[in-house]
Amino acid sequence: MRLISLFIPLLFVLGCSKRSDSSTQIFGHAATGLNISNAIYHNNTREAIDYALSLPQCGGVEVDVRMDANGQLWLFHDQTLESSTDLNGAVESSTTAYLESGRYRSLKQEPLAALTSDLVNVLHKGKTFLDMKGSSVANKDSLLASLLSLNLDTAQFSLIVPTEALFHLFKNRFPTYLALHEFSDLSSSLLESEPELRGICIRNEKITREQVNFLKSIHKKTLIYEVRSPKGIASALNKNPEALLSDDLKLAIGLRY
């Protein structure tokens, strides 16, 4: 029984044919994936980015971005620091010096990664989606100034924003995608009146192949995330989006190429 239990999942993985007809690019979600128990490095760290960009056929990474109380940008996913680090509070209410002292509670205890010009140079090895987190419109001027100070190459860097207000803030400066909880949240008026909208970012289970094709027909792109299993990755690749933000980067690359 033990051999059979090992053999059946292997057959399933091998049975997921490579999508040679797909044009989808593979990106690392939060660099090397969120909530991965056997991850080599913690998500959104410099080490995770270096690893992801070293993999052949990796198109780049998606990383989560928050701004601290001093206007410095950081790669950090969670709303609270204590959920994954030896710090307390939130990035938005913390000083730069305080965040520089922090470490993740991971095997390698990586430091938190500030989005500096040095890290931007590393990210230039691929393309990057900056997923803007916790960014209220109240601090929009500081947020925009912090991003502009990095002199980002807009051929290499795009933004993912959670609200239409932030889309309007960034649309004339950066290629910008709107994050959606449901496909039905996408308003027809936005599609019709905003040619600057590059596309949407949405969970795999929330969009169909037909909806992806509809967006393509009006020159909008789709970024799909929350895919980590062989079945989920194959399902997402079958929809042929612009990019797949995968939580299992090596598996997604293997199934795609």
Predicted regions and their residues:
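Bacterial N-terminal signal peptides
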Residues: 5-13
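Phosphate-group recognition and catalysis centered on beta-loop-alpha active-site segments
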Residues: 16-257
